[in-house]
Amino acid sequence: MQAGRLLLRKAWSALLTIGFVLVLNFFLFRVLPGDPARAGIKDPRMTRAAQAAIHARFGLDKPVLNCLASLNPLRRGPCLVSPLQTQFFIYINNLLHGELGISFHTKIPVGELLRARLWNTAVLLSAGQTLAIVLGVAGGVLAAWQAHTRIDYAALIISLVAWSLPTFWLGLILLFWGSRYAGLPIGGQLTPGLAAAGTWAQFTDAARHLVLPTLTQTIIYLAEYLLIMRSTMLDVLAEDYILTAKAKGLSTFQVLKDHALRNAALPIITIVALNLGFTVAGAVQIEAVFSWPGLGQAIFESVARRDYPVLQGAFLLLAVSVIVANLLADLLYSWLDPRVQAAL
């Protein structure tokens, strides 16, 4: 019963947040300066007729809301259209049908453009975050268990140095090392002119291209997870029930696995969920350094081109991903710590 109440409460809160994000996502990219038509074409000789035609093609000739100005600077007169013909209603209606608009630059649907990019970013983030979580948690547990020893001090120093490194700088260093000493590809996702898709050669080539960007992300986030896990594990190991478990004659592995790790892992779950948005933001730098064709690189290119539909679609995907990740983290948190459900 309590679990059901918690699920409904968290799901309702997530839906309200997504609704707010949808409204913010609509207005945020319509108050930005400049004319999207000129930004997409970049032709100073564009006539007013051509500019109006582009506005009509992308729906920018309609009012944002009823009786509010549209993005079309050529429109004059009062706003006498139906609310169903406004940009906001069309935007919501398109979202309900899975449409994110048309790119100003490539003239293809934003959903189609972001789908492939999102998959590439998901592969990169999954590989990097999985390694960072596993190694960071294991390193934090080891450092806490060996507190105030050479192992602990070495883990602290290395983690603090790694955590303070700028993402792009670390990427450039690994790029130089990987290309010169390890023979790894310096950028891209696949070697041009490779065999047909689905072959073993293509899989191994893609894996080699993934090594350096994954390693960059792993080093940055491994340090954070190790430091947090060490701190929380030290607090847990000082609890009375840990001393009782040791007094019962349980092995070190049993004490850590059955009594300490579950409670010490709670802050890590929250940090991983919150890091999702920051991870994608960091992926912009990583994908730019290694020319990885992911969502971060699409955002970087769209900012330079002022391709607002792509930015709007990417912002929406990132926001919804973070909200869903936090919802899952809250539910997992309540499962690991029954006190959360008891507090309802």
Protein language model features and the residues they cover:
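Helix-terminus/capping and membrane-interface signal
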Residues: 13-26, 30, 120, 124, ...
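An internal, D/E-rich "acidic patch" concept
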Residues: 64-137
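Hydrophobic alpha-helical transmembrane segments of membrane transport/permease proteins
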Residues: 18-85, 178-203
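Membrane-water interface segments at the C-terminal ends of transmembrane alpha-helices
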Residues: 24-31, 90, 94, 157-188, ...
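Residue-level recognition of pore/gate-forming positions within transmembrane alpha-helices
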Residues: 14, 44-45, 133, 160, ...
